[in-house]
Design a protein with these regions (language model features):
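Active-site mouth loops of central-metabolism enzymes
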Residues: 30-40, 89-103, 131
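Active-site groove signature of glycoside hydrolases
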Residues: 112-133
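N-terminal binding-site loop/beta-alpha segment at the start of enzyme catalytic domains
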Residues: 3-84, 146
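Beta/alpha (TIM)-barrel catalytic core signal, keyed to glycine-rich beta->alpha loops juxtaposed to Asp/Glu
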Residues: 132-328
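Short, well-ordered coil/turn segments that N-cap beta-strands
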Residues: 22-27, 53-55, 79-83, 117-121, ...
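A short, structured active-site edge motif that brings together acidic residues
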Residues: 81-94, 181-185
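Conserved beta-strand positions
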Residues: 29, 59, 87, 122-125, ...
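Short, acidic/polar
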Residues: 37-49, 99-114, 164-168
């Protein structure tokens, strides 16, 4: 069910998903930004984001002090019951995979402490380790769900095949399955692994991942799409005719993941359509995500709330099926 409320600048839309009591804002604010990673006071920025109607915030155990920064805001504003919190655990450290029951419990408990909350609306396993049976992790996530400590749960950077494996275990043991997933997805295809090391990042972007997208559509599992603007490549700061300039502007991870000819061609098409529709490139890129035939919530980060306000206008852009196909 979709709910709409008038935001200050644009009409923000909200969507209910399974096992989460509150509706999610269709655009999610990503808290892996310098001010929050460093644990500084981000209250003013978060106030402005919230004022735009964005009520869903994505953080993680390994985003430095991001959880503590978000928790500081929640405590000061007393608005925990009005927002949806997504957090993640089991990220590898120093090349050591951490997809184990012990690490999962440790990271969940640490997130509660840092966030200053006794429950997390959506909990994700940040990375996967395909050598590990998913069953024990499914058991632990169910324990926390049953205790009312986490709502929906799933994987970030888990392939759809591994999610299916986890859900088969859940089905065979009368347990709740993964009902949400957070891979990379966007018009900017993640061709390289931005971070590398260990079990890699999972994307469902680009022509080679049509099967994965069909699986999400058929299984009706919502996607929380990280790096939805290609870590800045489709944020309006890079021009399609200046590849060398892009490599200077974007961070090394973005260059490694996204700076490929195919994406500059997509960027040129997005620039053209943005001009025709009198809007911005990031608005077109986000509208492309929001106009897909499966349920997807783009994650967007920004150091300034004005950029988030501008990006939120993507919610008002309707793209024809032909435009969606042409952009890609």
């Amino acid at each position: 069910s979709e709910i709409r409320t008038k935001g200050r600048k644009s009409e923000v839309k909200y969507q209910k998903i399974k096992n989460v009591e509150k509706p999610l804002s269709k655009i999610i604010f990503g808290c892996a930004i310098p001010v929050m990673i460093q644990g500084e006071d981000a209250d003013e920025l978060l106030d402005e984001v919230y004022a735009q109607g964005i009520t869903t915030f994505d953080t993680a155990e390994n985003y430095g002090l991001s959880e503590a920064s978000l928790g500081h805001w929640l405590k000061n504003r007393g608005n925990r019951e009005k927002v949806v919190i997504i957090s993640k655990g089991c990220h590898p450290y120093d090349g050591r995979d951490r997809v184990t029951p012990e690490n999962l419990k440790h990271d969940i408990e640490q997130s509660f402490e840092r966030l200053g909350t006794d429950y997390i609306d959506i909990y994700l396993m940040h990375r996967d380790d395909p050598k590990v049976e998913p069953g024990p992790m499914v058991e632990i996530l169910n324990e926390y769900h049953k205790a009312g400590r986490i709502g929906a749960f799933g994987g970030s950077n888990w392939t759809h095949q591994r999610i299916a494996e986890a859900n088969q275990y859940a089905g065979e043991h009368g347990l709740i399955p993964f009902t949400v997933s957070s891979p990379n997805f966007g018009l900017c295809d993640q061709i390289g692994d931005p971070w590398g090391g260990g079990p890699g990042c999972v994307t469902i972007s680009g022509p080679s991942n049509a099967e994965a997208r069909a699986w999400y559509r058929d299984n009706q599992i919502p996607v929380l799409a990280y790096s939805s603007l290609g870590r800045g490549m489709f944020a309006g700061i890079v021009k399609s005719d200046d590849i060398e300039g892009a490599k200077k502007i974007l961070d090394p991870n973005a260059v490694k993941g996204y700076c490929y000819p195919e994406n500059f061609e997509r960027l040129a098409r997005a620039e053209q359509l943005a001009k025709e529709k009198d809007c911005t490139v990031p608005q077109i890129a986000l509208a492309w995500i929001l106009n897909q035939d499966f349920e997807v919530f783009p994650l967007v980060s920004a150091k300034k709330a004005s950029r988030i306000a501008s990006n939120a206008k993507a919610l008002d852009i309707v793209l024809a099926k032909e435009e969606v196909e042409w952009l890609d």
